[in-house]
From Swiss-Prot:
Domain Helicase C-terminal: 428-590
Keyword check for Nucleotide-binding: yes
The protein's name: UvrABC system protein B
Subunit-structure text: Forms a heterotetramer with UvrA during the search for lesions. Interacts with UvrC in an incision complex.
Top-rank lineage group of the source organism: Archaea
Positions annotated to bind ATP: G38, V39, T40, G41, S42, G43, K44, T45
SUPFAM superfamilies tied to this protein: C-terminal UvrC-binding domain of UvrB (SSF46600), P-loop containing nucleoside triphosphate hydrolases (SSF52540)
PROSITE patterns per UniProt: HELICASE_ATP_BIND_1 (PS51192), HELICASE_CTER (PS51194), UVR (PS50151)
Purpose: The UvrABC repair system catalyzes the recognition and processing of DNA lesions. A damage recognition complex composed of 2 UvrA and 2 UvrB subunits scans DNA for abnormalities. Upon binding of the UvrA(2)B(2) complex to a putative damaged site, the DNA wraps around one UvrB monomer. DNA wrap is dependent on ATP binding by UvrB and probably causes local melting of the DNA helix, facilitating insertion of UvrB beta-hairpin between the DNA strands. Then UvrB probes one DNA strand for the presence of a lesion.
UniProt keyword annotations, A-Z: ATP-binding, Cytoplasm, DNA damage, DNA excision, DNA repair, Excision nuclease, Helicase, Hydrolase, Nucleotide-binding, SOS response
Length: 655
């Protein structure tokens, strides 16, 4: 029986069947690296889902940010409802790593806010990988950062079954070693409680708590229970308990690690003292001795990851454990938007290293803290088995290494690439104004990209003064406001959106029929071939899609982007004519705006809310926030969190 079973009412269309067969054939032949060059809107995710079903391999999908990873996670969950589709991103809502600024003698301590829902999902991902083989993990570049050894993590996991011989104290001891906290009052995630011969455990991976009933030294019953009422919801014959944290170490390993940490500390203190760096020596000794004491007493300490080299028994320079190590040997990796994701993976190590060097140099951390790090790019390369790079504009790295480059140019919708028109820079503002008016009459929208923030502001002000309904998008606008701006553009609240880097906004909007690129011949990051092709793709969701590039000189980037788009457009039109396909603009439903669902604090005089109602309101918003996080709607969850903080501040002031 197949492990992976794709569930979709759609069949592969356009170039999808050819792409699926070619990629599957490559994987079956043992090809290590392949590229799917798929235009915007060609259904690359659906192609990937079909490939996974056909090759039947556990799969890691890497995206370059949390939001896109969440979208992919939701899509794969719909495609594979009967399989383990997991989500693995950084669990920090807010993260300020520890750092030291020598110029001002300022130490910035680590400050973070952990999203509990995401932590649950991270544990769910690692547990699925160690317990089943039908797993798809959608991840950000967090997957290359260090976590505990899968051998230690799996070794500490233990299964129980009705009829097994277990002493009560043995189970309690195992739970403590696995970093579960005994708390007979607060039954939170990662806690357990004991009542006579009954042990109740609240696991970290989000499943309901489990009750283990003993009769003497024998397990008499195992059942899932309701966390609030304690009522039994399901009887079980067996149950697997996994560690509460990814960094778990056995006592023998811990003793060895503590000895090695102490030896390294003595060596480093000697270096500082010989160099007359007495302040650094005192600072390092005080912090490290405290951490050693915590490790001896609790098996854990704040910032335990900085001792990961010693705790996992690694040597200097040895590859750290990451999520990739939890996968079996024969797995598939898919890099989404590879032209952005790969440079991000490549850059993680150097940024982390530079910050740690300063901390080590000034006595805030032992040198081995530098080994708590993301994978270097060469280590990432050696960790992958078979890989598919996915992008509309793959980079030179992917193309040079891929033994098979598969093009997916024909869209299932029949939509063709937009027509690209070249016009002179002189008079571009007035020329564009005429085009904007034409689109506004047809209830269509326009995206305009400028070279600088000042140009975008000036253009927006000028158009607004002469009656154009226009808005400006810039990097300082927060996520929630950005979502509102895009929503208002789609609804027709305004007709023109101006910005500098509209690529990163993910603006694939069916209402947009014109993309205007001002000063397109000014070579640079946002006017190179890749960026131009990506920007052109913003007009590919509308049947009337056009792109106007204003240039004085036909640069290589402009020539190549125009030629590639023109070639694809001809192929698409020819295919449609041959098969009698009539293109239609993509349909995407607009979500109803939540008018009263969230509390609009700015528009409400919250000082007049009675105390009792305020308490209830905070409670309701907290429930909504948890629900939003569970649905991966992190923007809404963050908004609710901020509203709760405001209300709690008011409550504190009035009490």
């Amino acid at each position: 029986m197949k492990k992976f079973k794709l569930n979709s009412p759609y069949k592969p269309l356009g170039d999808q069947p050819k792409a699926i067969n070619s990629l599957v054939d490559g994987i079956n032949k043992g090809e290590k690296e392949q590229t799917l060059l798929g235009v915007t809107g060609s259904g690359k995710t659906f192609t990937m889902a079909n490939v996974i079903e056909k090759v039947q391999k556990p799969t890691l999908v890497i995206s370059h940010n949390k939001t896109l990873a969440a979208q992919l996670y939701e899509e794969f969950k719909e495609f594979f409802p009967d399989n383990a589709v997991e989500y693995f991103v950084s669990y920090y809502d807010y993260y300020q790593p520890e750092a030291y600024v020598p110029r001002t003698d300022t130490f910035i301590d680590k400050e973070s806010s952990v999203n509990e829902e995401i932590d649950i999902m991270r544990h769910s991902a690692t547990q699925s990988l160690l317990s089943r083989d039908d797993v798809i993990v959608v991840s950000s570049v967090s997957c290359i950062y260090g976590i505990g050894s899968p051998e230690d993590y799996g070794e500490f996991a233990f299964g129980i079954a009705v009829g097994d011989n277990y002493d009560r104290s043995d189970i309690i001891r195992k739970l403590v070693f696995m970093q579960y906290e005994r708390n007979d009052i607060e039954f939170a995630r990662g806690h357990f409680r004991v009542r006579g011969d009954v042990i109740e455990i609240n696991p970290v991976h989000g499943t309901p708590p489990v009750r283990v009933e003993l009769f003497g030294d024998e397990i008499d019953a195992i059942s899932l229970i309701d966390k609030v009422t304690g009522k039994k919801t399901e009887s079980l014959k067996r149950y697997m308990i996994f560690p509460a944290k990814h960094f778990v170490v056995g006592q023998d390993k811990m003793d060895t690690a503590i000895r090695n940490i102490s030896d390294e500390l003595d060596e480093r203190l000697n270096e500082f003292n010989l160099s007359n760096k007495l302040l650094e020596a005192q600072r390092l000794e005080q912090r490290t001795r405290f951490d050693i004491e915590m490790l001896q007493e609790m098996g854990y300490c704040p910032g335990v990851e900085n001792y990961s080299m010693h705790l996992s028994g690694r040597k200097w320079g040895e590859k750290p454990y990451s999520l990739l190590k939890y996968f079996p040997e024969d797995y598939l990796t898919i890099i989404d938007e590879s032209h952005v994701t790969l440079p991000q993976i490549r850059g993680m190590y150097n940024g982390d290293r530079a910050r740690k060097e300063t901390l080590v140099e000034h006595g805030f951390r032992l040198p081995s803290a530098k080994e708590n790090r993301p994978l270097r790019f060469d280590e990432f390369e050696s960790s992958i088995n078979q890989i598919i790079y996915v992008s509309a504009t793959p980079g030179a790295y992917e193309l040079s290494r891929s033994s098979n480059i598969v093009e997916q140019i024909i869209r299932p919708t029949g939509l063709v690439d937009p027509e690209v028109i070249i016009r002179p820079v002189k008079g571009q503002v007035e020329d564009l104004l005429g085009e904007v008016k034409k689109r506004a009459k047809k209830d269509e929208r326009v995206l305009v990209t400028t070279l600088t923030k000042k140009m975008a502001e000036d253009l927006t002000d000028y158009y607004a003064k002469i009656g154009v309904k226009v808005r400006y998008m810039h990097s300082e606008i927060d996520t929630l406001e950005r979502i509102d701006i895009v929503d208002d553009l789609r609804r027709g609240t305004f007709d023109v959106l101006v910005g500098v880097n509209l690529l990163r906004e993910g603006l694939d909007l069916p209402e947009v029929s014109l993309v205007a690129i001002l000063d397109a011949d000014k070579e640079g990051f946002l006017r190179n071939e890749t960026s131009l092709i990506q920007t052109i793709g913003r007009a590919a969701r509308n049947i009337n899609g056009q792109v106007i590039m204003y240039v004085d000189e036909m640069t290589d980037s402009v020539k190549n982007a125009t030629a590639i788009t023109s070639k694809r457009r001809k192929i698409q039109i020819k295919y449609n004519e041959k098969h009698g396909i009539v293109p239609k603009t993509t349909k995407r439903a607009l979500k109803d705006k939540k008018v009263a669902e969230d509390l609009d604090i700015e528009g409400t005089d919250i000082s007049k809310i009675p105390k009792d109602e305020l308490r209830l309101l905070i409670s309701d918003l907290e429930n909504d926030m948890k629900e939003a996080a569970a649905k991966l709607d992190f923007e809404r969850a963050a908004s609710l969190r901020d509203q709760i903080a405001t209300l709690k501040g008011l409550k504190k002031d009035s009490s």
